[in-house]
């Protein structure tokens, strides 16, 4: 029988060498829950709560808590933690100056959700202010508030709290219960399936034909595919997570070999940080046990803020430090002449024959109630999306 260490390292070594686990169980958990009744309280928004969870379950290994000033500054300026480990996105806990003044260094803070439920405890080691414009410019490449990630930066409190965390309760993902797998559980799954090489695919969109083509192209060279959709906070116009999850199940069931693809949620908030977020996504998939990671066109982008292949260019600079193989794909399209999916590498035909697909186009057509042509989406997927969005509109009283 395989040991825990053998399972953890079966496919890949976690980022930083150790898969972090800051979840408490049993008597230790019960004791901290009791103690926390006396701790000062802080309510986390959905974004910070998802960060807390990902630190605790090891998705953000080697982080053990919210970043201190040395790590934060190094990440913003140099894409590395203070100890030299590659890390591209600040993972921080913002509060107002008034809130920060209420907490003493060395104290423990009870971390609650907006549902007034206790989720964890922060051991407060640092409080520090930061330059919002610098964070926006360095991390997102712009200071424009029209960028959803930058808007979040400007809306945050002016002080960051830092220190190690412990998790006592999990946020509710019960609607995706079957697919709620921690990094250690995903690694166990790969071990049980005998997958030694696994490609991870990050998405916040329904899987359209271009995605499917890229996933299957990658699958030709590895043992398995981990479809790892983000189900945390996204933009208001993104397709709701429950609808997307239905669409992922349908496409895997109907168009992928049963023993070659698996689905597991990534419970993170979407930052839309483009190239820098592509690096974070690769690190997270390494922690989930993947050996390969797909970076396509405008990865984690929004609007026209990033170049089509800017994420691929940045991640290529750090590939030696990543510990995961990056699979870079050109923009795929449907060629009406080839009558197939293709890229510029495989199709000789003029652009007038190319039907370009994107998550944005799919969302627009669905919002306008337009049918999705077969070049865009598998019919089973289109049906799920149309039905799911209709359900959401009815729930929201939109008819």
UniProtKB/Swiss-Prot annotation:
One of its GO terms (biological process) is hydrogen sulfide biosynthetic process. It comes from the Bacteria. Its EC number is 2.7.7.4. InterPro entries: ATP-Sase_PUA-like_dom, PUA-like_sf, Rossmann-like_a/b/a_fold, SO4_adenylyltransferase_pro, Sulfurylase_cat_dom, Sulphate_adenylyltransferase. The keyword Zinc-finger does not apply. Pfam families: ATP-sulfurylase, PUA_2. Keywords: ATP-binding, Nucleotide-binding, Nucleotidyltransferase, Transferase. GO terms for molecular function: ATP binding; sulfate adenylyltransferase (ATP) activity. The keyword Transport does not apply. It catalyses: sulfate + ATP + H(+) = adenosine 5'-phosphosulfate + diphosphate. Pathway: Sulfur metabolism; hydrogen sulfide biosynthesis; sulfite from sulfate: step 1/3. Belongs to the sulfate adenylyltransferase family. This is Sulfate adenylyltransferase. It comes from Staphylococcus carnosus (strain TM300).
